[in-house]
Amino acid sequence: MDFDRQQTIFSKRQEDIGKYEGVRLPYTVQPFDIKNTNNVREFLTNLRNGYKGFVLMDTPGNLSQQGLVPIFALSHYIVCPYQFEATSISSTATFIGFIAKLQHMLPVMKSRFIFVVNKWDKRYGRKAELELWDKTEERLRHFGLVAPRIEGQGGYATVQY
């Protein structure tokens, strides 16, 4: 599900469909406009009650976007990408605080965090930075699961069909 207004993941999937015409792709991407909170809540409740499997949802990065509360409240897991740089860590901390307040207001909310470092390159980082990154991950473990670092060069991964 692509809930983000820019619909980047949906657009990328449309390109894939054209590029791999006639090939059965292993998953679909559907766009969804989240402006109407009631529509979001109804859609996710129906999905949660009637679908067996995994649904990945891309959401806007702006926490003031209408429709985000039911997405987070009805999710089992919240995958939170971050980078080892000050602005990203600060934004991640703000997001953790937002979700904590939401969980306090909605005790039925049982979402769990999975933190995934984005654009990590094992070739970079001085000793002090590496220690800081380790401490950052240790701190994040207080709030959820920290996925192992996966080296990447950024952008989208290429999948061969």
Regions found by a protein language model. Name each.
Residues 1-56, 61-62:
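P-loop/Walker-type NTP enzyme "switch/lid" segment
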Residues 6-9, 62-64, 88, 102, ...:
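Catalytic P-loop NTPase motifs of RecA-like helicase/translocase cores
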Residues 50, 66-86:
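Inter-motif core of Ras-like GTPase G domains
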Residues 54, 72, 114:
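Hydrophobic "anchor" residues on beta-strands that sit immediately upstream
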Residues 92-110:
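Conserved C-terminal guanine-recognition region of P-loop GTPase G domains, centered on the G4
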Residues 120-161:
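Beta-strand-loop-alpha "switch" segments that mediate conformational coupling across diverse proteins
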